[in-house]
Amino acid sequence: MAMSPALRNSVMAAISGGAIAIASVLITGPGGNDGLEGVRYKPYKDVVGVLTVCYGHTGKDIMPGKTYTEAECKALLNKDLITVARQINPYIKVDIPETTRGALYSFVYNVGAGNFRTSTLLRKINQGDIKGACDQLRRWTYAGGKQWKGLMTRREVERDVCLWGKQ
């Protein structure tokens, strides 16, 4: 599935804000609830049983039964993306475009830094093979041992943005 024109335009507008801004727009979408994660203000269990809230935030700080505000959700996302950046930036040993970095932040926000650090995707980045690294995103479409259409769509969008700097 191709990226919607509205999401494409929003991501392009975020480029000047850097990789965290790009990842944030990918996750939240142009309308704030139509991105790669969607938003839910009440905690719920995701497809693999992890307590989740807002734009996919997980962690011990989630309060079951609480209804989160949009501002709280955006603050959690920003905090989470700053954490993602700190976790993965030291492992990226080559210069990459901000669009590639933003797509990687979105990806790692979804799969976790541990998975990224041991991935072929990271190895390809550090070998200077940006296209090969971006193509690796298509392999990450499973959760709980099952392939998910939503993850397939997400990875295609992330791959598209990942490759923007190569075009």
Curated annotation (Swiss-Prot):
CDD domains: endolysin_R21-like. The signal-anchor, which may also be an uncleaved signal sequence tethers the SAR-endolysin to the membrane until the latter is depolarized by the holin, resulting in the escape of SAR-endolysin from the membrane. SUPFAM superfamilies: Lysozyme-like (SSF53955). One of its GO terms (biological process) is peptidoglycan catabolic process. InterPro entries: Bacteriophage_GH24 (IPR051018), Endolysin_T4_type (IPR034690), Glyco_hydro_24 (IPR002196), Lysozyme-like_dom_sf (IPR023346), Lysozyme_dom_sf (IPR023347), SAR_endolysin-like (IPR043688). It is an enzyme of class 3 (hydrolase). One of its GO terms (molecular function) is lysozyme activity. The lineage of its organism: Viruses, Duplodnaviria, Heunggongvirae, Uroviricota, Caudoviricetes. Signal-arrest-release (SAR) endolysin with lysozyme activity that degrades host peptidoglycans and participates with the pinholin and spanin proteins in the sequential events which lead to programmed host cell lysis releasing the mature viral particles. Once the pinholin has permeabilized the host cell membrane, the SAR-endolysin is released into the periplasm where it breaks down the peptidoglycan layer. Keywords: Antimicrobial, Bacteriolytic enzyme, Cytolysis, Glycosidase, Host cell inner membrane, Host cell lysis by virus, Host cell membrane, Host membrane, Hydrolase, Membrane, Signal-anchor, Transmembrane, Transmembrane helix, Viral release from host cell. It comes from Bacteriophage PS119. The active site is at residues 37, 46. It catalyses: Hydrolysis of (1->4)-beta-linkages between N-acetylmuramic acid and N-acetyl-D-glucosamine residues in a peptidoglycan and between N-acetyl-D-glucosamine residues in chitodextrins. HAMAP family: ENDOLYSIN_T4, SAR_ENDOLYSIN. It is a single-pass type II membrane protein. The chain crosses the membrane at residues 10-32. This is SAR-endolysin. Belongs to the glycosyl hydrolase 24 family. Pfam families: Phage_lysozyme (PF00959). It is found in: Host cell inner membrane. It comes from the Viruses. GO terms for cellular component: host cell plasma membrane; membrane. PANTHER family: LYSOZYME RRRD-RELATED (PTHR38107:SF3), PTHR38107. Its EC number is 3.2.1.17.
